[in-house]
Design a protein with these regions (language model features):
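Ligand-binding pockets and gating/stacking loops
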Residues: 1-443
Length: 443
């Protein structure tokens, strides 16, 4: 009898081909929403997605709220998946007594609910890591990050402070991490845990056992550092525990051959090639339960995306292009804004292309998309755009425009975590602390 870990195997031109089975009727309950054997619901995945330099207010903010909002120029690229996307306008980032760190305050506030106190550092774990602490047990990787522009530093996934989790920098590096050494075919009859992983787990256990003695000999500052270290050790042990179990491949997917090396940088033509491929690998990673939390970035804050031949590029255009007196906005910048939405759509389409249970992978995800500024020319933070996609396994309504009416951006983060079934009553700190999710979206 088949079980949900069964894989089809074969060879193609001498290479191993692996295809996971979909959630067949015999594996699901009568509604196609849960595993028949255990009654457990399909896993809900979480993803953050970062793009730099925001959008143009006159071109993206709908005039009407609710489900029947009008299509705006800069939301038009998202129309194919409009019914699965929520748009949030009228949100603000309060810096309180901190400076407005250019191109950083919006990033930190959106990702943590806290106004940053230092440039390029987060004042707590980012939202994806807070979610991963709860949902990732049993997945091979607690979380994975990827940079479409090929810079490992372009990751806005962090354990707090300067502890940013480095991003995979190319489709090949992401593929190798996910489906290279350590990825085993669970349908093999002789499947067994990797001895190297077993040895590493044993060594870590010995180190952890010596924790108490070491901590007694340290001062307060060093004890804090050791706490961070042992937290990392524990997370490594949990990952290894997952690797010592058969991986779960639960969607109708074929693991492709490794991609070729390709240029990964800020040139828009390259991003248009790389982003869909990285997105496809991200979708496969979540569909095969390699990870349940994924962070994707297409640029840094203050995006340096450029079109070959454009002497200014995106970032410089936001500061040097004059506002057209007739249009009331910067037309070149507005075009770059649209390109960002097109790249975001390519990410969502890859998630939506994988059938799973009674819907698609996107239906069983929640994607949290954020940026660094509202109006890039002056680094304004009021009106910073926020987007979510996917219904988190039916826990969030979609297809809405929500006008935040000046409320803190942290309300979106709290709403997202509530939809992910994270137990918390408030999120953020200072002026951005909130106990008010957008309850009209929660199911």
């Amino acid at each position: 009898m088949l079980d949900r870990r069964f894989l089809l195997r074969g060879s193609c031109q001498g290479a191993l081909a692996v295809m996971g089975l979909p959630f067949l009727d015999c594996l699901l309950d009568s509604k196609g929403k849960a595993l028949a054997a255990s009654g457990r619901p399909l896993p809900t995945r979480f993803s953050t997605y970062f793009y730099g330099l925001g959008l143009t207010k006159q071109l993206w903010v709908p005039k009407t709220a609710g489900k029947d909002y009008e299509v705006t120029e800069q939301l038009k690229p998202l129309q194919p998946l409009r019914a699965k996307i929520n748009v949030f306008s009228g949100l603000r980032v309060a810096v309180d007594n901190n400076p407005n760190y250019q191109h950083w305050s919006g990033v930190g506030a959106s990702a943590t609910g806290i106004s940053p106190t230092k440039m390029s550092q987060f004042d707590s774990k980012t939202i994806d890591q807070q979610v991963a602490d709860v949902v990732s047990r049993g997945a091979r990787f607690k979380s994975v990050a990827a940079s479409c522009a090929g810079d490992a530093r372009q990751s806005y996934s962090s354990l707090g402070g300067a502890n940013t989790l480095p991003a995979e920098v190319s489709p090949l590096s992401l593929y190798t991490r996910l489906f290279g050494p350590g990825f085993q075919d669970p349908s093999k009859g002789d499947w067994k845990p990797d001895p190297q992983v077993m040895l590493q787990q044993s060594v870590l256990s010995v180190v952890a056992d010596d924790r108490k003695r070491a901590m007694q000999e340290l001062g307060a500052s060093d004890r804090s550092r050791m706490d961070q270290y042992f937290t990392s050790v524990r997370e490594a042990e949990l990952q290894m525990q997952a690797e010592l179990q058969r991986p779960e491949i639960e969607a109708k997917v074929a693991i492709p051959a490794a991609p070729e090396e390709m240029a990964c940088n800020n040139a828009l033509p390259n991003l248009r090639k790389v982003t869909p491929l990285m997105s496809r690998l991200a979708a496969l990673a979540m569909a095969t339960d390699q990870t349940r939390v994924f962070h994707m970035s297409v640029s840094e804050p203050g995006s340096q995306i450029f079109i070959p031949g454009d002497s200014l590029g995106y970032h410089q255009s936001t500061h040097e292009e004059p506002i057209d007196p007739l249009l009331g906005y910067q037309p070149r910048v507005a075009n770059y804004n649209v390109y960002n939405m097109e790249l975001f759509l390519s990410y969502l389409q890859e998630l939506d292309a994988i059938p799973e249970g009674d819907g698609t992978l996107l239906d069983h995800c929640l994607v949290y998309a954020f940026t660094d500024v509202a109006f890039a020319k002056i680094h304004a933070l009021d009106g910073i755009p926020m987007l979510t996609a996917g219904s988190a396994n039916g826990r969030m309504k979609t297809g809405y425009h929500i006008n935040g009416d000046g409320s803190p951006v942290s309300r979106v983060g709290l709403t997202a975590q509530k939809a992910m079934d994270i137990s918390l009553e408030s999120w953020g700190s200072g002026s951005m602390e909130t106990k008010s999710p957008f309850t009209e979206l929660l199911v």
